[in-house]
Amino acid sequence: MNRPGNRPSHEQADDYLDKGIALCRRAGFQSILLDGDTDFMQTWKLDAWDRTGYITFVFGADAGKTLVGKAEALPQTAWRRLERPDRYEVRTQERAKPENVKERVVRERGYKNLILQWEDVAEFDHQPHLCQQPYRMVALRKKIAVERGMERLFEEYRYFFYITNDRVGTAEEIVFQSNDRCHQENLIEQLKNGVQAMRNPLDNLHSNWAYMVMSSLAWTLKAWCGLLLPVTPGRWESHHREQRHTILRMEFKRFRNMMLRIPCQIVKTGRRIIYRIMSWNPWTSSLLRLTEAMYYPMRC
């Protein structure tokens, strides 16, 4: 969606979501997930999306008085402690954490500091005003300690809500899935600064739209390289899956340096052409496996 930056992000969001759904269906996708923040919770469309049977949605909901009141009215037994998984796996020896310099400076200068104590999750049914049926509402409760300098002032609860028609996944999975939506912000950043797709170098809307589409093809090709990278069953299966996941999340600058900017000598002999790679990096083997996988035409 290409429009002036002074327009609200959720304007006509339901229309564009419907267009995206139609496009995915034409492409053959059997199930579709809609994931967005509070501004994209189009309550007048939830019933229609739910009736399709193939659309699952997870939207953030504003922590208004009604939802906060329902969450506070839940019995304590309805809440479960949320344990977040580690961001990465330590493969060698775990090292001691370095000093949090920012935390120390905040305390020394007497600034207000918010410290997360723990997180709890619960769920209940909630029917928005414009809906004809209730939906599953997952509540995330964070206990925050408010400090100023070396003194603790008070503790408070902050609530976050997620509305969904997914009745299968656990409340923890719904929260993690919604938090993973933040990767989309990284995608926008890469489209802007990685492949320079949002620079708007021309003087009219249609030309800038065409430039954006053509420039974003570079990022699309990177994504397809990650998706098409073969995974060999057996000893190297987990390593190959990790490589695929890394390429999908890799910044475009790193992808360009690791898999595109490779010095290569081209030798023409008889009836064949030989490509001799003149240097090696940790991703050279992945490039060769990808080349072998793409050598033959893909069949549907």
Predicted regions and their residues:
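Short acidic, glycine/serine/threonine-rich loops at helix termini
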Residues: 1, 11, 43-49, 68-74
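Short amphipathic alpha-helical "interface-anchor" segments enriched in bulky aromatics
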Residues: 171-205, 210, 214, 218-222
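An anionic, glycine-rich sequence signature occurring as long contiguous blocks
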Residues: 58-187, 193, 292, 296-300
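A short, flexible helix-boundary coil/loop motif
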Residues: 222-300
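Electropositive, glycine- and tryptophan-enriched low-complexity nucleic-acid-binding patches
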Residues: 1-27, 31
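Active-site beta-loop-alpha junctions enriched in small/polar residues
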Residues: 4, 37-41, 62-64
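Short, conserved catalytic/metal-binding motifs centered on acidic residues
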Residues: 32-41, 57, 162, 184-191, ...
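Short, surface-exposed basic-aromatic patches at helix termini and helix-loop junctions that form
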Residues: 26, 46-55
